[in-house]
Amino acid sequence: MLSALGGNLSNARQSIAQVLNFALVLSTAFMLWKGVSIASNSSSPIVVVLSGSMEPAFQRGDLLFLWNRAERTEVGEIVVYNVRGRDIPIVHRVVRSYTEEDKKLKAKNKKAGLPTVAPQKLLTKGDNNLADDTELYARGQDFLDRKEDIIGSVRGYIPGVGYVTIMLSEHPWLKTVLLGVMGLMVILQRE
């Protein structure tokens, strides 16, 4: 009877150890993601190219690394932005930049003794597109606001690696297969 109880405790310990190891892996991945987000000053420091609008510079499925620490964005720079009201990142090149003087901000900063930096407005376009992105922007928006809309500027990429993400989102059954294989590996590893 005691040997059966000891075997059950051993299985319980093994199960708890596996759950804790899995939690450790998840929390480590989350902390790494947050650390990279803070270092790059970008809410999403790694994105996948979802369309062919930036060909030949970037292909669908390329993994992009973003940086958002620069004060200004230059014409010709490739940026990733979110359209207000939608949560799909768009990767396009800045084709025009200008600053818009905000009289209220200028008066407020002058009163506080702070320098006034006019907000930067950007117009973007995909390299493989004929027209600029004004049709993609939110209703009534003609330009992107540098501080509000830009997720980051592209600083590096790995070709094709992000295609796994695209496949998983386009074919939901692949997620089920992947989870089943992972579960099977956990069960087989226990023995």
Curated annotation (Swiss-Prot):
Catalytic machinery residues: 53, 92, 133
Keyword Transcription: no
Topological type in the membrane: Single-pass type II membrane protein
Protein's cellular compartments: Endoplasmic reticulum membrane
Transmembrane segments: 19-39
SUPFAM superfamilies hit by this protein: LexA/Signal peptidase
Lumenal compartment residues: 40-191
UniProt region (C-terminal short (CTS) helix), positions on chain: 177-188
Swiss-Prot/TrEMBL keywords: Endoplasmic reticulum, Glycoprotein, Hydrolase, Membrane, Protease, Signal-anchor, Transmembrane, Transmembrane helix
Topology Cytoplasmic: residue spans: 1-18
InterPro entries found in the cross-reference section: LexA/Signal_pep-like_sf, Pept_S26A_signal_pept_1_Ser-AS, Peptidase_S24_S26A/B/C, Peptidase_S26, Peptidase_S26B
GO CC annotation: signal peptidase complex
UniProt superkingdom: Eukaryota
GO molecular function, one term: serine-type endopeptidase activity
Chain positions carrying an annotated carbohydrate: 41
Main location class: endoplasmic reticulum
Gene Ontology BP terms: signal peptide processing
Catalytic activity: Cleavage of hydrophobic, N-terminal signal or leader sequences from secreted and periplasmic proteins
Domains (record comment): The C-terminal short (CTS) helix is essential for catalytic activity. It may be accommodated as a transmembrane helix in the thinned membrane environment of the complex, similarly to the signal peptide in the complex substrates.
Family: Belongs to the peptidase S26B family.
Annotated function: Catalytic component of the signal peptidase complex (SPC) which catalyzes the cleavage of N-terminal signal sequences from nascent proteins as they are translocated into the lumen of the endoplasmic reticulum. Specifically cleaves N-terminal signal peptides that contain a hydrophobic alpha-helix (h-region) shorter than 18-20 amino acids.
UniProt protein name: Signal peptidase complex catalytic subunit sec11
Species for this entry: Talaromyces marneffei (strain ATCC 18224 / CBS 334.59 / QM 7333) (Penicillium marneffei)
Gene field: sec11
